[in-house]
Amino acid sequence: MIEVITAPEHKYLYPSAVKVFLAGGIQKCPEWQKQIADALVKDYNDLNPLDYGFGRDIVLMNPRRAEWLNEPGAAQKQIEWEFDMIEKCDIFTMYFSGGESDQPICMYELGRNIERMKQKFPNDWMNRIVITCDSDYKRVNDVVIQTDLASDQRLGVSVVEGKDESIKEHFEKIKSYLKTWTRKPLT
């Protein structure tokens, strides 16, 4: 089963589930998180679920709210939700879309979360991070430099031409990681 949790939802997350955080631009960016989630759910439902592993559930954590509430404390709750979900994730993904926004908060979050994954999963952290850039993203070079510096080795940022193609590449990489991680035995 694939479940999508959207901010600010809080649900019990089964320890055996593979948890994936969909980080990346939200404001002035396409709704790529929903495209990824919908494609993964469709792919999972179209295939034999055993292709994804042996009964391991998948939880996609989407920080994009259906609608933003302009009320006191909304930003605080959003950021707390994101920190909580990122701390629980097994796979961290970040997508940088082309368009109006430079996504400066995402640039900060990228380095911070590479470090977090290195500390949480010291033996296999590189197999738990997916980073993709639309070639139209204004700061592609900054993303590549930051990931190289944060990881002490080439992490492998995918830079793909075109919004649809880059989202498809991000989907394929996440799907590949999920097929690997849902097959791993529970520890």
Model-derived segments and spans:
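Conserved catalytic or regulatory cores that recognize and/or transform ribose-phosphate-containing ligands
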Residues: 1-187
